[in-house]
Amino acid sequence: MFCTFCLKDRNYYMFKLFKDYWPTCTTECQICLEKIDDNGGIVAMPDTGMLNLEKMFHEQCIQRWRREHTRDPFNRVIKYYFNFPPKTLEECNVMLRETKGSIGDHEIDRVYKRVYQRVTQEDALDIELDFRHFFKMQS
């Protein structure tokens, strides 16, 4: 059997992992306090460059808040608002480039911090193998 491995850059891999891990995490909108669903939400990056995924918002909630207030609900000066998980690779690239670190001690922050550190700092190679194209699925 002949196998071909396609190695992608770390940002692409992080983009994929952000989406893959999202359904395993839960957080709530810090404005309406309802659960953020599987489609994700908005995370604000303060001028410190530190992400805190526990402090996320529904898109509609933060849009309404921003129309009525000059600062975010935690009185931070916000540099960027990102979809999380990122909707595009380009958005993921900007978020990764601008992020200086991650803060927060809730489970969602710990999960993504571990994933980020593993992909960006460890000397390891992750290879994704998809054998569905090679083997017929039995009914």
Curated annotation (Swiss-Prot):
Record's keyword terms, sorted: Host cytoplasm, Host nucleus
UniProt keyword DNA repair present: no
Chief location bin: host cell
Organism superkingdom: Viruses
Cellular component GO terms held in the UniProt record: host cell cytoplasm; host cell nucleus
Pfam families listed in its UniProt record: Baculo_RING
Cell location: Host cytoplasm; Host nucleus
Function: Plays a role in nucleocapsid assembly.
Record's protein name: Protein AC53
Organism of this sequence: Autographa californica nuclear polyhedrosis virus
